[in-house]
Amino acid sequence: MFLFDIYNNILYYTKEFIVTSTSPNLFIHGLMAVFIIYLLTKRPFKPRQNDTLTKAEEDELIREWSPIPLTPKSNPLEVLNQTELIIQESEGTHVTINNKKYLNLARSNYLGLINNPEINKISENAIRKYGVGSCGPRGFYGTIDVHLDLEKKTASFMKTPEAVLYSSAYATISSAIPSFSKIGDIIIVDRGVSQPVQVGVSLSRSRIYYFNHNDMDDLQRVLEQTQFKGSKAKIVRKFVVIEGLYYNSGTIAPLPQILKFKEQYKFRLIMDESHSVGVLGSTGRGLTEHYNIDTNLVDILTGSYGNSFSSGGGFCCGSPEVVYHQRLNGVGYVFSASLPPFLACSSTKAIEMLEENPKMLEMLHSNIGELYQGLNKSGALNGLLEITSLPISPVIHLSLLDSKSNKSNRINDELLLQKIVDKAMDYGLLLTRAKYVSAEKFIPKPSIRISVSSNLSSDQIKQSIEIIKKCTSFVLESN
């Protein structure tokens, strides 16, 4: 009787809806009536009562169960990359590993300032005054006077209006890019950029286009491709991202041609100079000085204090608007503890030393030239390896010649190069393969990466060339 009354009421109100409602309301009310009828008439859900397994059946299922690995099995290269060398002591050009000294050509110490007595003394005094940490982000009690001093010094050195300081070199470029480029914007990236740049591009969630490394014809093709016209035309922000000196290849960007495109196609230029500041140019101010170009033509310029200035952290230079925007929107600036004050002091001192003693640059350029020419001369690498870097780069990549390379199996090439590295250690020379993470968009060909320092002596360079030659012949001619 109760259900009969409900149905009568539903029919009554349905009739009223039909009489009083307009067409859209009639449709909606009709759907509601059908849905109510469905809820009232559908059968209630009753879970099935499964039979309880016997002890024998449970044991059988357990025996048949095979767990899936929590992580995929490591390939031989991944296992090799997990091998660590523990450095017991670092002194000048040498490091101590397992109580044995090695000449270190694996560390980025371009101006030879690591363990410099003057910088060590400055750092020690800063620790006594400020402690070892800053106790907070820059916007929350983490700003110390030495941070502001370093920002002013960096802006002055780079000849830009202002600079902002980050506590991590990696986070500098990976925070700067997404702080400006957002969803809907366009980023055009050189395929040769290193991992931190790739991370920044990915975090931006912008539309990403790649052009072949240092290929200006391909860059122009992509720029034309992203020039929307007609009905598709709309105002979008467009960025081109490059490195001054590419860590993955030891080559430099053709900045003059890129700036011509910048004027023609109206994009903003982001350039990372982590490996060119303190290296290129007559006074070490980077790629802009190398080409005698005004730094302010680059909209956003980032760099590191670690490779040339023996410290930590990074910087971003630009107009006051560019710098101020990052103080509010740069994730690595806002949400990270600020750079330890003693590292800020050491970076400031290192820049001052470079300004006062440009001979450090002359020594670096001389050492790069001597090592490059020594390796490049006829017979030095026995026709087995080739240098893929430029003769002005402190980052020298040695790759297998195509005749010795197994292009179908990268792991074999990596293992072969690692044998050369291991053999060099037997002679007291520390080298390293160029190692990349699997998440990198474009992984360069396998290589041995050598880092040149200004404090290497001519005898050490000649010794290194002979060891590399000897180890290359021993490994590759026997394979």
From Swiss-Prot:
Component of serine palmitoyltransferase (SPT), which catalyzes the committed step in the synthesis of sphingolipids, the condensation of serine with palmitoyl CoA to form the long chain base 3-ketosphinganine. The keyword Acyltransferase applies. The gene is sptA. Its EC number is 2.3.1.50. It is a single-pass membrane protein. Residues 1-16 are lumenal. Pathway: Lipid metabolism; sphingolipid metabolism. Its cofactor is pyridoxal 5'-phosphate. It holds the Pfam family Aminotran_1_2. GO terms for cellular component: endoplasmic reticulum; endoplasmic reticulum membrane; serine palmitoyltransferase complex. Residues 38-479 are cytoplasmic. It catalyses: L-serine + hexadecanoyl-CoA + H(+) = 3-oxosphinganine + CO2 + CoA. Gene3D superfamilies: Aspartate Aminotransferase, domain 1 (3.90.1150.10), Type I PLP-dependent aspartate aminotransferase-like (Major domain) (3.40.640.10). It comes from Dictyostelium discoideum (Social amoeba). The chain crosses the membrane at residues 17-37. GO terms for biological process: ceramide biosynthetic process; sphingosine biosynthetic process. This is Serine palmitoyltransferase 1. It is an enzyme of class 2 (transferase). Its main location: endoplasmic reticulum. It is found in: Endoplasmic reticulum membrane. Forms a heterodimer with sptB.
